[in-house]
């Protein structure tokens, strides 16, 4: 069984504040391409991600879409109970829809947030229960994903754990490919 941890920037770190922002379509396009490649190579059974707004929720959406055509499953894990309680109503609704749609949902802590140890426990759970990771993260533009990136780097010192890092250069290249494909599909 091949289990993939998918994480990356939060939506605000990519300056995406609307569901119809074209950057979201590009990120989903990149993730879909990567997931399909892994599926077709027999390297993907589970997409396991968090519930943060941004790359993690988009990865879950892509996983659910692909599960209509491929034998893959999608899981969302959160670091503590009541994860989305402080979000606005629209974001809570998106979270609840995803939570109800995925194949598996759980929290790595049975309590609401009380301190950062829950976040570290979540990270450790994710890396120990997956076989590889995909991150949308650019080392030249640090953000929240740096904590996951640093953990993966440390883990790789003692374990085989492939990391596919998608940076802004690759996103730009894929944005051009995405636009070209859309243009060709229109005619």
Curated annotation (Swiss-Prot):
InterPro entries: YspA (IPR010697). It comes from the Bacteria. Gene3D superfamilies: 3.40.50.450. PANTHER family: UPF0398 PROTEIN SPR0331, UPF0398 PROTEIN YPSA. NCBIfam families: PRK13660.1. Belongs to the UPF0398 family. This is UPF0398 protein LBA1157. It comes from Lactobacillus acidophilus (strain ATCC 700396 / NCK56 / N2 / NCFM).
């Amino acid at each position: 069984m091949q289990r993939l941890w998918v994480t990356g920037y939060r939506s605000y770190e990519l300056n995406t504040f609307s569901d119809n922002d074209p950057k979201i379509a590009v990120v989903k396009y990149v993730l879909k391409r990567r997931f399909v490649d892994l599926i077709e190579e027999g390297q993907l059974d589970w997409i396991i991600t968090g519930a943060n707004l941004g790359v993690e929720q988009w990865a879950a959406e892509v996983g659910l879409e692909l599960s209509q055509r491929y034998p893959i499953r999608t899981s969302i894990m959160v670091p503590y109970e009541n994860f989305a309680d402080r979000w606005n109503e629209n974001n809570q609704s998106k979270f609840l829809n995803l939570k109800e749609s995925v194949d598996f949902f759980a929290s790595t802590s049975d309590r609401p947030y009380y301190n950062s140890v829950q976040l570290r426990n979540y990270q450790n759970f994710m890396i120990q229960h997956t076989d590889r990771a995909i991150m949308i993260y650019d080392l030249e533009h640090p953000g929240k994903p740096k904590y996951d990136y640093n953990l993966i780097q440390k883990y790789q010192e003692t374990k085989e754990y492939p990391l596919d890092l998608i940076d802004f250069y690759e996103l730009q290249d894929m944005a051009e490919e995405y636009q070209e494909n859309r243009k060709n599909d229109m005619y």
